[in-house]
């Protein structure tokens, strides 16, 4: 089926979203045009508003409409803990755990092959934040991928001479998981990171 230039433009625009391929973009575009034009207008307005008004928190670098995000603006948070994450979605995920410390959001992970070194992801800013704060512990919560592990190792090495404790989130068998279904790498991490049972 051949689409008009405007429909083709809409389909191409929708394809920039993660996980949206050609067929999904076509279905979305046709749905908006045939069944939900008012929803399409709301989507366009919300997208425009967000792109114009959402920036980055000046302290932790997560997405925020204000100079300080809600977590950084909250005086009740624990100023002794700093959790380092790879992106804003990680802040949301960790917030669901009840964590009450502060955050620092990297711009991804180290990837020399892609030209992403320490400066590109914000390591100098992280070091400045640690030096300026009263943090006792830096919790590295990068993804358990090769790049995430390399980033965590680099941060830990860089902070080794500071007065803060550097820790890494645990990796391993998920709660409710069955060992026979867990991959070897995950199980290996779980065994290496074992801890005593508190009675």
Curated annotation (Swiss-Prot):
Keyword Transferase: no
Pfam families per the UniProt record, alphabetical: RecR_C, RecR_HhH, RecR_ZnF, Toprim_4
Any one GO molecular function term: zinc ion binding
GO terms, biological process: DNA recombination; DNA repair
Domain of life: Bacteria
Keyword line: DNA damage, DNA recombination, DNA repair, Metal-binding, Zinc, Zinc-finger
Ranges of residues in domain Toprim: 80-174
Listed CDD domains: TOPRIM_recR (cd01025)
Zinc fingers (C4-type), renumbered ranges: 57-72
Family stated for the protein in its record: Belongs to the RecR family.
Database matches in HAMAP family: RecR
Function: May play a role in DNA repair. It seems to be involved in an RecBC-independent recombinational process of DNA repair. It may act with RecF and RecO.
Designated name of the protein: Recombination protein RecR
């Amino acid at each position: 089926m051949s689409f008009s230039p405007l429909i083709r433009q809409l389909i191409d625009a929708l394809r920039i979203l993660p996980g949206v391929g050609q067929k999904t973009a076509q279905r979305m575009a046709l749905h908006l045009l045939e069944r939900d034009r008012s929803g399409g207008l709301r989507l366009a307005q919300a997208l425009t508003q967000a792109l114009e008004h959402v920036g980055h928190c000046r302290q932790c670098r997560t997405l925020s409409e204000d100079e300080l995000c809600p977590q950084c603006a909250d005086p009740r948070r624990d100023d002794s803990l700093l959790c380092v994450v790879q992106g804003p979605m990680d802040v949301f995920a960790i917030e669901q755990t009840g964590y009450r410390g502060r955050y620092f959001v990297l711009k991804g992970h180290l990837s020399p092959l892609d030209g992403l070194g320490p400066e590109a992801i914000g390591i100098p800013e992280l070091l400045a934040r640690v030096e300026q704060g009263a943090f006792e512990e830096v919790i590295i919560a990068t993804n358990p991928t090769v790049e995430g592990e390399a980033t965590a190792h680099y941060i830990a090495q860089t902070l080794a001479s500071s007065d803060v404790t550097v820790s890494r989130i645990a990796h391993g068998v998920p709660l409710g998981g069955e060992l026979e279904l867990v991959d070897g790498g995950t199980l290996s991490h779980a065994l290496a990171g074992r801890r005593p049972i508190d009675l």
